[in-house]
Amino acid sequence: MPHRAPRRFMKTAPGACDWEQCLLMGSGEPTRARAVVSSSHKQRKPRQEISACLKWLVFLLNSIVFLVGVGILALGVYLFIKDFREVKLVDIILNPAILISIFGFSICVVSFFGFMGALRDNIFLLKCFAACVFLSYILVVAVTLVFFTLFYTDTTEGLSANWLLLYAVKNYHTNRNLAEIMDALQENLECCGVSSIAQGYRDWNMSYQFNCTNSNPQPEKCGVPFSCCRKSVISEAAGSSNPLLPAMRSLECWQNALTKRPGDLEHDIYTRGCLQPLRTLFESHAVHVGAFVALLIVPVCISVCLTNILAKQVDHQRYLLEREARRNDRRRKRDHNRRDQLNSLDLLEEGKFNNASANATRPRPPDIPPPLPPIEHVPRKKSRNASSSPTRKPKSAGVENAAARRKRTATTTRTPPAAAGPAPTPQATTTNRTHQWVLQQTDLVPQKSKS
């Protein structure tokens, strides 16, 4: 039979070998296989799912907006400190410095969520930024609708522009912010009072400071604010050579204005109310306001979409990292199991060689078994062919039956084969034969016929 060449060492799996091959190679090959196991699997990095361009775009845009918000917040705080006044709950809306500060702070917080979430790949901050931007747009839309409702509602009761202006007139002396707002409206819109077109200035009779009642102790009794005076009167007085004339003329224009007729005051103060000019101003810019709010949805949608895309990319990248970590754990466990198997092969090889060396040093047993001990033979008496005794009579049926019963009794008293003890020795065999011969001589056991 031709000699068969040994098979080459082939790996059945990355870093593993055939069991028979490893067993035949000895203790050196499994060690080399372990090196293959440890070096076959390299740490692979998952693919990059986060777009660097998108990430840094979101970061830069939100950083710029954050700096703008910081500037607006600083301006509001500066204005509030420069003209510090008592702050009430209504001043949150009426005080421009507080409004500017709140607006700047809101921009800072929202933009901080955006650029910090993009920088740190934080899904929670990115989603907070998108939600805040969307809610801010909803708030802008709601405020715009409120303004449209105020100026296009003619009811004197309830929330309307007429009600707000009357509230400002009644609380002119109690809130400095309201006083400044009313003065700015009357100077810029060239009006005085609220509602009436010809006699709007008479609405100041509802003010605690300017009413004409006998219980009013104020020096401004029956007057109107200085902002109701016409600019032409002040400018004419300012062009005079008398430096005291502008001050005197400004005092004369508003004093006792509520006691005079509109025709007597046309050259000194504005007589029409501020509601109609304010409504006309809003109507002229209503289209621009609506277009601005409508176009504002474009950058809002872009920022929300970009942020959500970035958040999904970060989430998918985390999923890939976790999946790769799980794969690495399974790979390490598999390599550990392979090392254990190879170690067991080494131990098996060492045990096989140790057994072979022990068998080589142990003396070889002889091929011929040792002789059995000699069997002692008891000399057997020869039976006489002819007996000198007289001829025996044939046994009767009763004697034969008694002999059969004794035979059955002796058979039942013997030990069953299943419960028999160890194999009988030669001496016991000889004794049994002698006992059988004695029984045969006494005719208790029938003799076998010789053919």
Swiss-Prot record:
State the annotated membrane topology for this chain.
Multi-pass membrane protein
Chief localization = membrane
Compositionally biased region (Pro residues):
366-376
Q: Which residues does the record list as glycosylated?
A: N205, N211
Localization in the cell: Cell membrane; Cytoplasmic vesicle membrane; Endosome membrane; Early endosome membrane
Query: In what tissue types does this protein appear?
Result: Expressed in the germline, particularly in sperm cells.
Instruction: List, alphabetically, the InterPro entries matched.
Output: Tetraspanin/Peripherin, Tetraspanin_EC2_sf
Q: Which UniProt keywords apply?
A: Cell membrane, Cytoplasmic vesicle, Endosome, Glycoprotein, Membrane, Transmembrane, Transmembrane helix
Q: Which GO terms describe its molecular function?
A: protease binding
Pfam families named among the record's database cross-references: Tetraspanin
Per the record, its GO cellular-component terms are: apical plasma membrane; basolateral plasma membrane; early endosome membrane; late endosome membrane; plasma membrane; recycling endosome membrane
* Cytoplasmic-side segments: 1-56, 118-130, 307-451
The record places the motif (Basolateral membrane targeting) at 20-24
Q: Which residues lie on this side of the membrane: Extracellular?
A: 78-96, 152-285
Q: Which family does it belong to?
A: Belongs to the tetraspanin (TM4SF) family.
This protein's name = Tetraspanin-14
Which organism is this protein's natural source?
Caenorhabditis elegans
The gene name on file is tsp-14
